[in-house]
C-alpha cells in the first residue's frame, strides 16, 4: 500500500434514537446517530406484525374481476 493516501480508521460511537450506543470503527471520524438498531427494530425484538394480504387480493378480484372475464 502507498503511504499517506489512506483515510484514518478510528473508533466511533453510533448512537441509536432508543439510546443504545454501538462502538464501531469508521473513516468518517465523528460519532453518528442511527434511527433504528437491533435493540429497537421490530424484526429483532419480536414485535413484527404480519400483514394479511389475502384480504386485499380478494377485494381486488371482487372489484376488478369483471374486467378480466371474457
From Swiss-Prot:
Binds 1 zinc ion per subunit. Belongs to the bacterial ribosomal protein bL31 family. Type A subfamily. This is Large ribosomal subunit protein bL31. GO terms for molecular function: metal ion binding; rRNA binding; structural constituent of ribosome. SUPFAM superfamilies: L28p-like. NCBIfam families: L31, PRK00019.1, PRK00528.1. Part of the 50S ribosomal subunit. One of its GO terms (biological process) is translation. Binds the 23S rRNA. PROSITE patterns: RIBOSOMAL_L31. Its cofactor is Zn(2+). It comes from the Bacteria. Keywords: Metal-binding, Ribonucleoprotein, Ribosomal protein, RNA-binding, rRNA-binding, Zinc. GO terms for cellular component: ribonucleoprotein complex; ribosome. InterPro entries: Ribosomal_bL28/bL31-like_sf, Ribosomal_bL31, Ribosomal_bL31_A, Ribosomal_bL31_sf. The keyword NAD does not apply. Zn(2+) binds at residues 16, 18, 37, 40.
